[in-house]
Amino acid sequence: MTTRQSSFNYEEILSCGRGELFGPGNAQLPLPPMLMVHRITDISETGGAFDKGYIRAEYDVRPDDWYFPCHFAGNPIMPGCLGLDGMWQLTGFFLGWLGEPGRGMALSTGEVKFKGMVRPDTKLLEYGIDFKRVMRGRLVLGTADGYLKADGEVIYQASDLRVGLSKDKAA
């Protein structure tokens, strides 16, 4: 059995954004400023809430992050969709880490709950993604539940995050 790397630093995550980590044409994270992950602290193909694998990651919030001045002037808040996108980014990363071929795309999610906000004084975001299943066919499909913590408090939850990997290039 091959032992896979179980954590990734920022430089390794950037290499995924450049298409180097999993090879050309395979799962790729966005590059800054759209990259919503700074570290993957733990990743496993077993365990998690459904015993089908999990990923844990972190993002360091800075008061000068690009979205604060424009969302909203006088009341800076990170857009909730960026936290949700971070969950999709990690779901796709997991599929690439498993060695599955193809380019990633967010497909859907079930219920999303926003219970708090990310403000400039927030220090650390922590992601938790727990896999329910990975289906392998013409399209590789990962389904997971996820959460986002801000300074230790769960503020976002999403069920049935779905990301697919396709060998077709984006149009």
From Swiss-Prot:
Span-the-membrane segments of this chain are none
Enzyme Commission numbers on file: 4.2.1.59, 5.3.3.14
Name where it's found: Cytoplasm
Key word Calcium present in the record?
A: no
Matching CDD domains: FabA
Q: What does this protein do?
A: Necessary for the introduction of cis unsaturation into fatty acids. Catalyzes the dehydration of (3R)-3-hydroxydecanoyl-ACP to E-(2)-decenoyl-ACP and then its isomerization to Z-(3)-decenoyl-ACP. Can catalyze the dehydratase reaction for beta-hydroxyacyl-ACPs with saturated chain lengths up to 16:0, being most active on intermediate chain length.
Quote the protein name from its UniProt record.
3-hydroxydecanoyl-[acyl-carrier-protein] dehydratase
Q: Which gene encodes it?
A: fabA
